[in-house]
Amino acid sequence: MFVSYRWLQEYVDIKDVTAQELADKITKSGIEVEGVEVLNKGVKGVVVGHVLECEKHPEADKLSKCLIDIGEEEPVQIICGAANIAKGLKVPVAKVGAVLPGNFKIKKAKLRGEASHGMVCALQELGIDGKLVSKEYADGIFIFPSDAEVGADALEILNLHDEVLELGLTPNRADCLNMLGVAYEVAAIYGREVKLPAIDLQETAEKTSDYISVSVEAKEENPLYIAKMVKNVKIGPSPMWMQTRLMAAGIRPISNVVDITNYILMEYGQPLHAFDYDKLGSKEIVVRLAKEGEKIETLDDQERTLQSHHLVITNGTKALAVAGVMGGADSEVTNETVNVLIESAYFAGQTVRRTSKDLGLRSESSARFEKGIDPTRTFEAIQHAAALMAKYAGGEALEGVVEADNLQVQERTVSVTAEKVNRVLGTNISASEMGTMFTNLKFPFTEVEGTFHVNVPARRPDITISEDLVEEVGRLYGYDHIPVTLPSGTMTRGKLTAAQTKRRKVRRFLEGAGLYEAITYSLTSADKAKQYMVEPNEKAPVALALPMSEERSQLRLSLVPQLLEAVSYNVARKNDSVALYEVGSIFLPTEEGELPKEEQHLAGVMTGLALHHAWQGEKKVVDFFVVKGVLEGLFDVLGVSNQITYAPAKREGMHPGRTADIVLDGEVIGFIGQLHPEAEKQLDVKNTFVFELSLVKVFGTDAEETYYSAIPRFPSMTRDMAVVVTKETKAGEMKQVIAEAGGELLKDVTLFDLYEGEKMEEGKKSLAFSMNYFDPERTLTDEEVTEAHNRVLTAVEEKFGAELRK
């Protein structure tokens, strides 16, 4: 929001405050002033000149030789290249010695043999942004009104002795998107009164209702619509003071009627629209929702295709404007316009925002409707606009307005105690001081024993709860005046939760095992969202309503797909050995309309070499058992290794013979295995193994306590055993049977060999176990170990039909 310092002085007396001081004060009150721009940019020596004579330069067709009265004893000769220079005009002249933007000094010169004592200026040459210059003067010099005084300071007439404050408004302070809103803010800061604009409206005997009727079909989207007629206007330039104020506000002047609607927009914050009444095609205005596919050509000469939730202003059949966004070209005010219908309305911000976004079309009006306007100013704004059109466009304002009013503005009363204000702010402000602040804010209130009951004006929709009033007091008191204090309260010793401690253990172990932590997107594409799920889920993944792209449109149900993307990316760049893990959330869909269930998972991917250079010079390739070994070590650290088993499994996207479910106390909590060859081919990777498991379920299991014992004084005895079993026999189950059969003396069982070679009978395999027998109190005899070992042999023969391999 650009605020003209001189324009602001019309509403609040701040002549004793400089623009920079005002900017500092506003910033300290909670509204950031991003900058203060001096409009004249160091320009001096520019006056109003009267062109007495103008003829073609004898040596150059595109130059004119002019004799110009600049208010001095003698007129001066100036050579000018502007096409619109002519005798009798009053123009801005930079005299010899004048300074223009960029410290450009005007000197006497000769152009094609003719002396030139100065320079006739375009607005751009005086430092005005070319985008703000009206089309009439965009390619030529500026022309003053005929009543401009010769020799007068041109910058004063152009209002360039002004400074503009740029406010960086947050969305909740839409009340300051207009000059009156800023005036209320400044008046509250300095404790001064707001001078509201005077409206001098003279109406004719004819009535607006004789020319137009208004009906609203979409009452929820448009609770208030007001129309007023102004006849017999004469389209021309708006007065100089209005043009300069609009340019200071960042708006390009167009014509008197259009400029007046923009001026009211900047003054009241109430968007208006002016229709050429004679182009409406009927004597009625109907506000309705658009028909699907309905088309309209807007003022920017673009044809727009509307949707059924867009709000339009129509003549009963044809769309004339996109409500709250932009008018239509068919009813545009042009130089031929004679009769004007003014629109002032209150459109629902959500409707305007959605329409604006759908059409990719934003305007000053839509920005204000989106954030919310003051509905109590709608009538006042249209009356003021009609008065200005009567005065500056020669129009005749017809009596009254036509309106469709379904708006109910409810009073808002918010209460707060003085005790709460001081407690929250850490101040000691008296109740009387707070009352003065509410008075300065123009908030009517009553006070009962230190409790303020504040009636919030409609212009401040951001004030809804007591904390908002606390903020208002804090802003006006000055955040810089709030005393600095140390935190109070009992200091407590912080500690990690059990889950945090376990997550740190997981990270520390996996990084020690050579895996790197990755953090991937929680959003994925529809085709990847349901890949590699730990548990099947028939419900559709949770989709975003407005995704930025299809690649990031749904919440993930597994961590593996995103990790595989990272591995594929690395392998494509010649980083063939990759080991990654991620601790992150998946999002399980629940009942429709409910939030998804968020569950923390651990996933990992390993490919390439597990060991690059052993001391013997060997290299070890990642395989199923390498990855399984990593998980076994992790489960051991977490104290759940004895509760974990593995079961062969078939999962979509996984190798059918090299995949297993991870089972905790009989419940599947994850999986481990190699990618299916087709999946590896799609990702352009080889020998890639993955795992994923639910940390919630692992952490929810009681961990075994860790015990420490002295280094044994007595030796242990080791026996190896190789048995032939069917290929379907699970080594894990056999290991468990061996441990139970060996009794107390058997301390450790390790599978050290699996053989399925040519020497084995079809359908058979060999499993070799190493068993360690030990008693901490004595040395075992060979007979004791043999007895325990024989029990083991008997158990595996009976349970699995195993045959001792010789």
Curated annotation (Swiss-Prot):
Cofactor: Mg(2+)
UniProt-recorded Gene Ontology molecular function terms: ATP binding; catalytic activity, acting on a protein; magnesium ion binding; phenylalanine-tRNA ligase activity; transferase activity; tRNA binding
Alphabetical list of Gene3D superfamilies matching this protein: 3.30.56.10, Bira Bifunctional Protein, Domain 2 (3.30.930.10), Ferrodoxin-fold anticodon-binding domain (3.30.70.380), Nucleic acid-binding proteins (2.40.50.140), Phenylalanyl-trna Synthetase, Chain B, domain 3 (3.50.40.10)
Catalytic activity: tRNA(Phe) + L-phenylalanine + ATP = L-phenylalanyl-tRNA(Phe) + AMP + diphosphate + H(+)
Gene Ontology biological process terms from the UniProt entry: phenylalanyl-tRNA aminoacylation
Similarity field: Belongs to the phenylalanyl-tRNA synthetase beta subunit family. Type 1 subfamily.
Disulphides: none
Cofactor note (record): Binds 2 magnesium ions per tetramer.
B5 domain mapped to chain residues: 409-484
GO CC terms: phenylalanine-tRNA ligase complex
Domain of life from the UniProt record: Bacteria
Keyword entries, A-Z: Aminoacyl-tRNA synthetase, ATP-binding, Cytoplasm, Ligase, Magnesium, Metal-binding, Nucleotide-binding, Protein biosynthesis, RNA-binding, tRNA-binding
List of residues binding Mg(2+): D462, D468, E471, E472
Key word DNA repair present: no
Keyword match Metal-binding: yes
Span of domain FDX-ACB: 712-805
Pfam families, alphabetized: B3_4, B5, FDX-ACB, tRNA_bind, tRNA_synthFbeta
Stored InterPro entries: aa-tRNA-synth_II/BPL/LPL, B3/B4_tRNA-bd, DNA-bd_dom_put_sf, Fdx_antiC-bd, Fdx_antiC-bd_sf, NA-bd_OB-fold, Phe-tRNA-ligase_IIc_bsu, Phe-tRNA-ligase_IIc_bsu_bact
This enzyme's EC code(s): 6.1.1.20
Quaternary structure, from the entry: Tetramer of two alpha and two beta subunits.
Subcellular location(s) of the protein: Cytoplasm
Leading EC class: ligase
Name used for this protein in its record: Phenylalanine--tRNA ligase beta subunit
Residues of the tRNA-binding domain: 40-155
